[in-house]
């Protein structure tokens, strides 16, 4: 891994990285977020009983839309032509959580890590928004990159070193 920050130019100013000379390769990234809530709130999500509607369906669409808008939200991100975005949910009644996993893919000159992280984060925020009327104490946690592949730096899996 490089010790220098790629978004800082020689004069110390923030700048967008020039990716024009990078090879076009298939890039993939997986990210997660977790929403911890009251057990009753989780049951209302599971059985689609909240007044605002189908929480997981809306959160899925919000996460997909967020990945597509990542460059509008994070100033130095490149606008990307994503070929695939998915957002999936795992309801854990024992821990009263919704685990969100996002996946982004493209063939391009820069990675999709930020898009995957944005998808998982916005899906979590959407769950919070749709459930806050019954549970303002929810906690969004464990937002992280799980895995990425493609590009010059190769494969990364959380817990591993960059190869």
Curated annotation (Swiss-Prot):
Gene, per the UniProt record: moaC
Catalytic activity, as annotated: (8S)-3',8-cyclo-7,8-dihydroguanosine 5'-triphosphate = cyclic pyranopterin phosphate + diphosphate
Pathway: Cofactor biosynthesis; molybdopterin biosynthesis
CDD domains xref list: MoaC_PE
The protein's name in its UniProt record: Cyclic pyranopterin monophosphate synthase
Subunit details: Homohexamer; trimer of dimers.
Binding site for substrate: 76-78, 114-115
Family, as annotated: Belongs to the MoaC family.
Species the sequence originates in: Cellvibrio japonicus (strain Ueda107) (Pseudomonas fluorescens subsp. cellulosa)
UniProt cross-references to Pfam families, sorted A to Z: MoaC
Record-listed E.C. numbers: 4.6.1.17
């Amino acid at each position: 891994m490089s010790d220098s920050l790629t978004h800082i130019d020689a004069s110390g100013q923030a700048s967008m990285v020039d990716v024009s000379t990078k090879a076009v390769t298939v890039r993939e990234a997986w990210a997660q977020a977790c929403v911890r809530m009251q057990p009753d709130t989780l049951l209302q999500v599971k059985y689609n009983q909240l007044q605002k509607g189908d929480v997981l369906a809306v959160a899925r669409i919000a996460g997909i839309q967020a990945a597509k808008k990542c460059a509008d939200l994070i100033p130095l991100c490149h606008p990307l032509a994503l070929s695939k975005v998915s957002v999936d949910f795992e309801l854990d009644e024992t821990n009263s959580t919704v685990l969100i996993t996002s996946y982004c893919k493209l063939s391009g000159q820069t990675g999709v890590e930020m898009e995957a992280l944005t998808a998982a984060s916005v899906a979590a925020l959407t769950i919070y928004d749709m459930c806050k009327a019954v549970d303002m104490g929810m906690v969004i946690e464990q937002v992280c990159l799980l895995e990425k592949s493609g590009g010059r730096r190769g494969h990364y899996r959380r817990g591993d070193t960059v190869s």
